[in-house]
């Protein structure tokens, strides 16, 4: 049974099993991914969405809504409490506003941002970072509540700024967000050093993912892109540029 499998490939066993349960055939899955694994870039969600689309497309037509549902089910085999945020963005593309109670809303605006992703190559565990945040909350309830309120306000501000295409101000908000993350203890010396380089050479830089390792990202524009890439490469960091994809899953 699926529950007995202990492997990061568990979501694919789930998808394959579900797709052929009433069919007299097997299935072989090969995964080719350029996304660094376990680096806070949503590689598992991207693979779950691609896997669900590819596997179920073999047996007939499938809508994006159905792909998303299957991808989230598959991801839950390894991350039980996943919000589905990463799978949703991978499926539909663009920028998503996510609220735990209201769900997802796509922002109908396509800003021309350039991102630089920088990998610390430090292993980290999402679970241990979540525990660390929980521990901080239990010990510092008032401070945690204050930071949560500041974060909610910051998200509201960023949503407005994205719609107005104000890249410089968005960068400042990213730096502010990074301060909040450092306050709750999910950064470390190496990430702080990387972020300092990013903040000095771009509009803003912060941790992506759960922290403790993995990647950071810096926000820039076309004219400054090569300069930032060079800065990080000169400091022996693995980095690459990325743009926001507004199509999402495009095999349909």
Which residues does each PLM region occupy?
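C-terminal nucleotide
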Residues: 1-10, 14-17, 58-61, 69-81, ...
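Metal-dependent C-N hydrolase catalytic cores
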Residues: 2, 31, 35-37, 48-51
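Glycine- and acidic-rich phosphate- and metal-coordinating loops
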Residues: 12-39, 70
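Short beta-strands and strand-loop turn motifs
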Residues: 32, 174, 207-211
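Residues that form or immediately flank small-molecule/cofactor binding pockets and catalytic motifs
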Residues: 34, 212, 244-246
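FAD-binding core of FAD-dependent oxidoreductases
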Residues: 38-48, 82-93, 206, 210-213
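DPxDG-like acidic metal-binding loop motif
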Residues: 41-62
């Amino acid at each position: 049974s699926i529950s007995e499998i202990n492997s990061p490939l568990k979501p694919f066993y789930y998808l394959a099993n579900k797709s052929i349960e009433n069919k007299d055939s097997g299935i072989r899955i090969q995964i080719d991914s350029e996304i660094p694994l376990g680096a806070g870039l949503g590689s598992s969600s991207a693979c779950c969405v691609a896997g669900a689309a590819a596997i179920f497309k073999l047996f007939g037509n499938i809508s994006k809504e159905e792909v998303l549902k299957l991808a989230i089910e598959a991801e839950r085999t390894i991350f039980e409490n996943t919000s589905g945020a990463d799978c949703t963005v991978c499926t539909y593309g663009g920028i998503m506003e996510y609220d735990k109670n209201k769900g997802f809303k796509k922002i109908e605006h396509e800003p021309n941002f350039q991102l630089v992703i920088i990998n610390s190559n430090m292993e980290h565990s999402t679970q241990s970072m979540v525990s660390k945040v929980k521990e901080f909350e239990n010990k510092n309830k008032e401070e945690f509540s204050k930071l949560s309120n500041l974060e909610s306000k910051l998200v509201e501000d960023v949503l407005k700024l994205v719609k107005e295409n104000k890249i410089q101000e968005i960068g400042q908000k990213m730096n502010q967000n990074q301060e909040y993350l450092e306050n709750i203890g999910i950064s470390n010396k190496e990430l702080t050093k990387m972020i300092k380089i990013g903040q000095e050479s771009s509009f803003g830089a912060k941790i992506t993912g759960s922290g403790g390792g993995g990647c950071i990202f810096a926000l820039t524009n076309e004219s400054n892109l090569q300069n930032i890439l060079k800065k990080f490469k000169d400091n022996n960091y693995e980095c690459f540029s990325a743009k926001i994809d507004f199509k999402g899953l495009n095999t349909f």
